[in-house]
């Protein structure tokens, strides 16, 4: 879908790394008409809205949120990669770690997690899974 198109990606993101020289998707990037890097995802969308680029490559939750709030954009079905996210704590701050773990476990146990997963099926794979 993007062959010959102008594409924007945020500087310093995994999207940029994948598309850059030596990245896993370097060959895909070579099919683009041009690849612009922007300092922020908002700048990417500004360039898209202004017609400077034909598409932007951003994380799916960012794209989904932006499209919901701004008419005239759509998300393509292709996914370029998958990432996992975690929560980091200062070394030795076990109390904070335990507090966050307990809060997340609570939403799993009380069914809130299942409701979130049902309401937002596109992001369910990005949510934290815990054992009961």
Indicate residue ranges for each PLM-predicted region:
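Short, Asp-centered acidic motifs that coordinate Mg2+ and/or phosphate
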Residues: 54-55, 74
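Bilobed "Venus flytrap"/periplasmic-binding protein-like clamshell domains
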Residues: 1-45, 60-64
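Soluble non-cytosolic domains of exported or imported proteins
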Residues: 9-13, 39-42, 57, 90-98, ...
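Hydrophobic residues within well-ordered alpha-helices
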Residues: 2, 47-49, 87, 100
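Conserved functional loop/turn residues at catalytic and ligand-binding sites
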Residues: 6, 52, 111
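Short, flexible helix/strand-to-coil boundary loops that buttress conserved ligand/catalytic motifs
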Residues: 23, 67, 117
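Periplasmic-binding protein-like
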Residues: 15-18, 60, 64-120, 123-132
């Amino acid at each position: 879908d993007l062959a010959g198109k102008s594409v924007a990606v945020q500087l310093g993101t995994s999207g940029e790394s994948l598309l850059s020289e030596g990245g896993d998707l370097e060959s895909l990037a070579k099919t683009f008409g041009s690849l612009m890097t922007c300092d922020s995802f908002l700048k990417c969308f500004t360039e898209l809205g202004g017609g400077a680029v034909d598409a932007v490559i951003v994380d799916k939750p960012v794209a989904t949120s932006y499209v919901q709030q701004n008419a005239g954009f759509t998300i393509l079905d292709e996914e370029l990669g998958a990432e996992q996210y975690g929560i980091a704590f200062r070394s030795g701050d076990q109390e904070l770690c335990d507090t966050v773990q307990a809060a997340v476990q609570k939403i799993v146990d009380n069914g809130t997690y299942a409701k979130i997963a049902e309401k937002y099926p596109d992001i369910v794979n990005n949510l934290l899974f815990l054992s009961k």
